[in-house]
Amino acid sequence: MPGPRSHEVGPAEARILMHKSRQVADAPVGDLATIRGLSARGPAGEIPLRLYDARAERGPGPVVLFMHGGGFVLGDLDTHDPFCAEIARLLDLPVIAVGYRLAPEHPWPAGVEDAIAAARWVAGSPDALGLAVTSLVTCGDSAGGNFAIVVSLALRDEPAAVPVLAQWPIYPAANPAKGYPSFQDFGEGYLLTHDAMRWFDDCYAPDPKDWRYSPMVKSQIGMPPTLVVTAGLDPIRDQGRAYAAACVEAGVPTVFREARGNIHGFINLRKAIPSSQADIEGCTEILKLLIAERTSA
């Protein structure tokens, strides 16, 4: 997309640009019975959340916990509003988006600690949520895909009040400390660039050996059924492919789906790239099958 690049203008201006791009590139939020703000107690104060539900009332069941992308630096509850509303409709499940702390103001591991805390809060079915949560489905795109995996690992090792039923990392930064061929193949001209990724990493300032940044340093044995989605023209495509392979090798029921001919960020580009709608719908159909298989067992 034309215009200044995130790494050229700094975090504050880059966040404004991301909001503006939603207005021209993404689909509208559309009708939904419930869109409601709430908050969870986090390690450094309140974590803003947003609940999306196609129903005004709902019985006990799974809840999708969504963590937005943006390189750990950009994005918020508003940038991914249309996507969260859409998957709430397509899955017919409540979706709760997490407004975690962003770098560089809050470097690693602040954001992922918020995501884990939010997951534990939602799992406890607090009165403020107004839902009887029986299980979680962790989900996120890009940096949020990293968080989805890390949250699943954290709750595998130290279980919450309810289990993680499935995970859905979308073009995840699953092994960001390792180089892969797709980084060179698609690092220029496909929206996400080499320079942007290096800038995100500098802002986030993670420990590359820590599983809360590089979740593939941990065994994936015992992880929930997993749907890994990549984009065919994405510099971090191969990270998602590698993560899917690691899950298969660990005996995790895994579905891998690649949006061929699409780019990083496509879930926020349904107006600019209309085929993204079909890519999203195909993913949700698979996820519904994974969830149904687990809930009927």
What are these regions (language model features)?
Residues 41-43, 49-60, 216-220:
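Short beta-strand-to-loop junctions in surface cap/lid or active-site-entrance loops
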Residues 60-69:
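Short beta-strand element of the alpha/beta-hydrolase
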Residues 78-97:
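Short amphipathic alpha-helix adjacent to the substrate-entry channel of hydrolases
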Residues 106-126:
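Alpha/beta-hydrolase active-site loop
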